[in-house]
Amino acid sequence: MKLFGTDGVRGKAGEFLDSFLAMRLAMAAGIYFKDKSITNNILVGKDTRRSGYMIENAIVSGLTSIGYNVIQIGPMPTPAIAFLTEDMRCDAGIMISASHNPYYDNGIKFFDAHGNKLSEDIEKKIEEIYFDDKLIQASKVDMEKIGQAKRIDDVIGRYIVSIKNSFPKDLTLKSLRVVLDVAHGAAYKVAPTVFKELGAEVIVMSDKPNGLNINENCGALHPANLAAEVKRLRADVGFAFDGDADRLVVVDEKGEVANGDSLLGVLALYLKEQGKLQSSVVATIMSNGALKEFLNKHGIELDTCNVGDKYVLEKLKANGGNFGGEQSGHIIFSDYAKTGDGLIAALQFSALMLSKKKSASSILGQVKPYPQLLTNLKIAEKKDLDKIKGLKELKKDLENKNINTLFRYSGTENLIRLLLEARDIKLLEKEMKNVVEFFKKALNG
């Protein structure tokens, strides 16, 4: 049984991800981290889901049972956990969140002592420990060695300072009217505080979490309400975050929702113009062809990697780069953060607007993405794509029609993601029907 998906362990809270799994997974991770332990402390944070209480208590129980001390910091963005794990010199960090998923899902993400997401090799080792009953039992400590847990409520200030330090000292947000949609999620306190302290006029939406409304018709996956509000209030820009604030969606002053690749492109160019861009930009295999064309036109190389911000970061490290991201809104400025951080990306885009003295729409309009269609098809089984009869011929036929393709399985669900890209939207719509029918027959028998 495989526990880890593309971004930690994730599933329906109380069913797949119940308190038993959370406790045992925490024990397994703790056993792994013990080998390199320095402080014997592990940091635990969460988003605003009600199930976070259940999972947090289970994780604390598991870690303390093997002798670890636990620092609980409550609702906090995922990138804050990455930063604070290193800043507070913990052996590891744990974030309880299902990111952009509905409230009934939850997840567990791990960070090493340096605030990095774990490699697949380390995740595999933790899985092996999880299923090793003898090792789990043998790792329980005597009563006098059981760890302690303490809750700290004032660490938010450390993260706010680090975020503000990413914003240019010679700029101020005083001239900007900004609408923030915090998705009833982990950034509901932090995001408004940062923008207000830097001088912006701030209007906040979806900032009243009740444990069940996270991401519900709001945030990065549902920016329509934000778009309407930006237009109604004649704001300069709108920023939508997801439940754990590791991704960003931008809405311009006209109420248009920006394409994630357009955002990547203009931010990369901004870094280059400042002399701060190192090596090539990294995006995922789902990036729009227009992004590569835009970057190449400005003398910037683009490398691609698998979907997932941890793979973007791995590629950046390998290339010696410092900027990359995903079309979905995970944007990594590795000079400032170890993972995608929606707040940092929002501040950098604000700085770009201010330094250029241009509107959001005129900046984002520099990159004109090609039409793409994405279909998430539910399937009965995940067959090896290389062994599906007729698939090679289908891809060749689409290629001959100047259609780019990407077919890949979801890492967490029984889905195949079907992506087509071309300059002709009508052609895409026609061919997508054929592609869907092909995979229905191939994977649903």
Swiss-Prot record:
Q: What is the lineage of its organism?
A: Bacteria, Pseudomonadati, Campylobacterota, Epsilonproteobacteria, Campylobacterales
GO biological process terms, semicolon-separated: carbohydrate metabolic process; peptidoglycan biosynthetic process; UDP-N-acetylglucosamine biosynthetic process
Described function: Catalyzes the conversion of glucosamine-6-phosphate to glucosamine-1-phosphate.
State the PANTHER family in the record. Answer: PHOSPHOGLUCOMUTASE (ALPHA-D-GLUCOSE-1,6-BISPHOSPHATE-DEPENDENT) (PTHR42946:SF1), PHOSPHOHEXOSE MUTASE (PTHR42946)
List the Gene Ontology MF annotations in alphabetical order.
Answer: magnesium ion binding; phosphoglucosamine mutase activity; phosphomannomutase activity
Q: What is this protein called?
A: Phosphoglucosamine mutase
Alphabetical keyword list: Isomerase, Magnesium, Metal-binding, Phosphoprotein
E.C. no: 5.4.2.10
Please state which protein family the record places this protein in.
Belongs to the phosphohexose mutase family.
Which parts form a coiled-coil structure per UniProt?
A: none
> What catalytic activity is recorded?
alpha-D-glucosamine 1-phosphate = D-glucosamine 6-phosphate
Coding gene?
A: glmM
NCBIfam families to which the protein is assigned, alphabetical: glmM (TIGR01455), PRK10887.1 (NF008139)
Which metal ions or organic cofactors does this protein require, according to UniProt?
A: Mg(2+)
- What is its EC class? isomerase
Q: Which InterPro entries match?
A: A-D-PHexomutase_a/b/a-I, A-D-PHexomutase_a/b/a-I/II/III, A-D-PHexomutase_a/b/a-II, A-D-PHexomutase_a/b/a-III, A-D-PHexomutase_C, A-D-PHexomutase_C_sf, A-D-PHexomutase_CS, Alpha-D-phosphohexomutase_SF
According to the record, cofactor stoichiometry and binding are noted as: Binds 1 Mg(2+) ion per subunit.
The species this protein belongs to is Campylobacter jejuni subsp. jejuni serotype O:2 (strain ATCC 700819 / NCTC 11168)
Q: Which residues carry this modification: Phosphoserine?
A: 99
| Record: residues binding Mg(2+) | 99, 242, 244, 246
* PTM description: Activated by phosphorylation.
